[in-house]
Curated annotation (Swiss-Prot):
It is an enzyme of class 2 (transferase). The gene is accD. It comes from Bacillus licheniformis (strain ATCC 14580 / DSM 13 / JCM 2505 / CCUG 7422 / NBRC 12200 / NCIMB 9375 / NCTC 10341 / NRRL NRS-1264 / Gibson 46). Binds 1 zinc ion per subunit. Its EC number is 2.1.3.15. One of its GO terms (biological process) is malonyl-CoA biosynthetic process. Its cofactor is Zn(2+). InterPro entries: AcCoA_carboxyl_beta (IPR034733), Acetyl_CoA_COase_Trfase_b_su (IPR000438), ClpP/crotonase-like_dom_sf (IPR029045), COA_CT_N (IPR011762), Znf-ACC (IPR041010). This is Acetyl-coenzyme A carboxylase carboxyl transferase subunit beta. It is found in: Cytoplasm. Pathway: Lipid metabolism; malonyl-CoA biosynthesis; malonyl-CoA from acetyl-CoA: step 1/1.
Length: 291
């Protein structure tokens, strides 16, 4: 009897493998906000222009999403979409990485260029996509942007650039750095002919892109919270041996120090751009605002 009391009884339960305990949730159906960590349905986030419904954080948009949110329906005509990078320096693994990004993004390069209308006003646009090689600027990216500027110059319409880039593409070395001068020179020629340049810096805009065409707009705008700068925060702090402000290199910091004209919420971007374009079409006449 005592033996029965102190003997261990086998528990009656079924063991469930860890893998079967997981819920089968399709990849991409949910998105976590990088700021407040709230988990949202991706389709609802996309409907809200990829702005967090809880904290207002602006998540990254790809080029196609941005074009759809800004240009009038059916007005966008893409050009130079078949241009693709090669491997001039024979950098190991570069071609394989390019192909992987092409398959992932359905793009041939890190920038989409074309022409269309915003609230009825024509413009040539270039939209960078950070999901392709982190939006880095190589020879083809620089060439596509330069050709877009020349197209705007030829058709005498404004040029709008949306930047999202980690900087120059290291796999192309000096050829990549040359694009800084080429794009800047093209903008200079366009500006000398009274061409309107609008630069919209989105997260992130860094390195050689921030140090060239991204900062050369007649209007320099940015999205809230965008990281904008040349060198990284840690490198700067180690160089100057000082601690930088918490909001250093954010869009709001740059606006406060006179390096931006405005920080524009994504929901207001189309209206803001449309207003700027219409103002320049009317020679500064603001009567259209009353209509």
């Amino acid at each position: 009897m005592l033996k029965d009391i102190f003997s261990k009884k086998k528990k009656k339960y079924a063991s469930v493998p860890a893998e079967s305990a997981k819920q089968d949730v399709p990849e991409g159906i949910m998105t976590k906000c990088p700021d407040c960590k709230k988990i949202m349905l991706t389709k609802e986030l996309d409907k809200n222009l990829r702005v967090c419904m809880n904290c207002g954080y602006h998540l990254q948009m790809n080029a196609k999403q941005r074009i759809k949110s800004l240009l009038d329906d059916g007005s966008f005509e893409e050009f130079n979409q078949d241009m693709m990078s090669e491997n001039p320096l024979e950098f190991p693994g570069y071609l394989e990485k390019l192909q992987k990004d092409r398959e992932k993004t359905s793009l041939n390069e890190a920038v989409v260029t074309g022409k269309g209308t915003i609230d009825g006003s024509p413009a040539v646009v270039a939209v960078m996509d950070s999901s392709f090689r982190m939006g880095s600027m190589g020879s083809v990216v620089g060439e596509k942007i330069t050709l877009a500027i020349e197209k705007a110059r030829e058709e005498k319409v404004p040029f709008i650039i949306f930047t999202a880039s980690g900087g120059a593409r290291m796999q192309e070395g000096l050829l990549s750095l040359m694009q800084m001068a080429k794009t800047s020179s093209a903008l200079k020629l366009f500006s000398e002919e009274q061409g309107l340049i609008i630069s919209v810096m989105t997260h992130p805009t860094t390195g050689g892109v921030s140090a060239s065409f991204a900062s050369l707009g007649d209007y320099n705008l940015a999205e809230p919270g965008a990281l904008i700068g040349f060198a990284g925060r840690r490198i700067i702090e180690q160089t100057i041996r000082e601690e930088l402000p918490e909001d250093f290199q954010t869009a709001e910091f740059l606006l406060k120090h006179g390096q931006l004209d405005s920080v524009v919420h994504r929901a207001d971007m189309k209206k803001t751009l449309g207003s700027i374009l219409k103002m320049h079409q009317t020679g500064g006449d603001l009567e259209w605002l009353e209509n």
